[in-house]
């Protein structure tokens, strides 16, 4: 994990083009961010877990606001992900979609093109449908995950974790 300014980016992550990283952003192993067609802006403490893809359409910038957590292998191709939203593992947000603040997109959810999701919505399914309002407990969980990943990124950057191949036998754990 390398530190770039106040952000943390895994050594094998690809960040190219017009991409703005705010303080505390943490981009994990195998992520690809392509700001080649329009700007991608990641707000403070955004967490992109392993294998995420973030891209845009030509001339349509994407903003991922403060405190957003994006689960493993999710794809963001939308316009806006509102603050403190959790995008579950493998979820897909298609072109021009706008996700309100404090939402939860369940794992595997597909948000279709140009769809607008209201704030504090729990969205599930293919295509994604709002199933209920996000509770305060749901929101606390998102905030906790964001804080946990930022802490881990800081520890990785300081060398607190072993190399990717792990520890040799007999060295404990």
Identify the role of each PLM range.
Residues 6, 10, 60-62, 66-75, ...:
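C-terminal segments of enzyme domains that contribute to small-molecule binding surfaces
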């Amino acid at each position: 994990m390398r530190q770039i300014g106040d952000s943390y980016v895994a050594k094998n992550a690809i960040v190219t083009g017009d991409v703005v990283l705010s303080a505390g952003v943490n981009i994990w192993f195998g992520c690809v961010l392509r700001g080649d067609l329009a700007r991608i802006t990641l707000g403070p403490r955004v967490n992109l877990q392993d294998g995420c893809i973030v891209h845009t359409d030509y001339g349509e910038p994407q903003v991922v606001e403060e405190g957003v957590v994006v689960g493993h292998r999710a794809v963001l191709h939308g316009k806006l992900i509102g603050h403190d939203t959790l995008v579950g593992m493998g979820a897909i947000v298609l072109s021009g979609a706008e996700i309100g603040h404090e939402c939860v997109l369940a794992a595997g959810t597909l948000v279709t093109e140009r769809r607008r999701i209201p704030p504090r919505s729990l969205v599930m399914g293919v295509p994604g449908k709002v199933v209920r309002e996000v509770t305060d407990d749901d929101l606390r969980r998102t905030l906790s995950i964001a804080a946990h990943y930022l802490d881990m990124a800081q520890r990785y950057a300081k060398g607190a974790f072993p190399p990717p191949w792990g520890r040799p036998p007999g060295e404990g754990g």
